[in-house]
C-alpha cells in the first residue's frame, strides 16, 4: 500500500522541485532516504524494566523494534561502564518512513504547546535535517498513563538533496511547518 505522502511526492512534489531548481534529470530530484530516531536512555541503563518500557514506546511510535546501543568503553565521569546500554536507535525506510513522517508533521508537531513552526537552521550542509523533541507525549499513540519516564528523542531526516536549500524545499513541499526565515 502506497502512503499518502509518498503519493504526494510522486504526483506533485517532484514537478514542483523540478521547476524550482531546474533539474534536467529525474534522478537529481531530492527524495527522502531514511529517518533515524535516536533516544538516550540515561538512568534507564541501570533499570532493565525501564529500558524495555522505553524500547516498547519507540516500537509503538516507529512501527519497528529499536536497536539498543551500548557503550564501547567505560567513562568514569559519566558513570558509564563498557557494554552498558546508552541509547536506542531506529532507522525507518520506505513505507514506514513516509507513515512516520506524516504522523510527525500532521499530528505530533501541531500538538506542541505554543508551536510556531520549527527552525529552518537545523540543516547539516548536505540537505539533511535534525529535529530534537523534548518529550514523547506529543504523539497520539503515547498516552500519559502509559509512560514511566518523560524522555525526548532526536529525529534525523536524511534526504538525497545536495544542498540545504534543496532539502528545505523538499521538506517544505512535504508539509514540514518551518518558521519564516532563511536556510543557512
From Swiss-Prot:
UniProt record, GO biological process: translation
Chief localization: plastid
Keyword rRNA-binding (UniProt): yes
GO CC, one annotated term: ribosome
Keywords, alphabetical: Chloroplast, Plastid, Ribonucleoprotein, Ribosomal protein, RNA-binding, rRNA-binding
Glycosyltransferase among keywords: no
GO MF entry, a single one: structural constituent of ribosome
Annotated localization: Plastid, Chloroplast
Pfam families: Ribosomal_L5 (PF00281), Ribosomal_L5_C (PF00673)
Family: Belongs to the universal ribosomal protein uL5 family.
Function, in words: Binds 5S rRNA, forms part of the central protuberance of the 50S subunit.
UniProt subunit comment: Part of the 50S ribosomal subunit; contacts the 5S rRNA.
Protein name: Large ribosomal subunit protein uL5c
Amino acid at each position: 500500500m502506497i502512503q499518502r505522502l509518498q503519493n504526494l511526492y510522486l504526483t506533485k512534489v517532484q514537478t514542483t522541485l523540478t521547476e524550482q531548481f531546474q533539474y534536467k534529470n529525474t534522478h537529481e530530484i531530492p527524495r527522502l532516504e531514511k529517518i533515524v530516531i535516536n533516544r538516550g536512555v540515561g538512568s534507564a541503563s541501570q533499570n532493565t524494566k525501564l529500558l524495555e518500557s522505553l524500547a516498547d514506546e519507540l516500537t509503538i511510535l516507529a512501527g519497528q523494534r529499536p536497536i539498543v546501543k551500548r557503550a564501547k568503553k567505560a567513562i568514569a565521569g559519566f558513570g558509564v561502564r563498557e557494554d552498558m546500554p546508552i541509547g536506542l536507535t531506529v532507522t525507518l525506510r520506505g513505507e514506514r518512513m513516509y507513515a512516520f513522517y506524516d504522523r510527525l508533521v500532521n499530528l505530533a508537531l501541531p500538538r506542541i504547546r505554543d508551536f510556531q513552526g520549527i527552525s529552518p537552521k537545523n540543516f547539516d550542509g548536505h540537505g539533511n535535517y535534525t529535529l530534537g523533541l523534548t518529550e514523547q507525549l506529543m504523539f497520539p499513540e503515547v498516552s500519559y498513563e502509559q509512560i514511566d519516564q518523560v524522555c525526548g528523542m532526536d529525529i534525523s531526516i536524511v534526504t538525497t538533496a545536495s544542498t540545504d536549500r534543496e532539502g528545505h524545499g523538499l521538506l517544505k513541499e512535504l508539509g514540514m511547518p518551518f518558521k519564516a526565515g532563511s536556510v543557512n
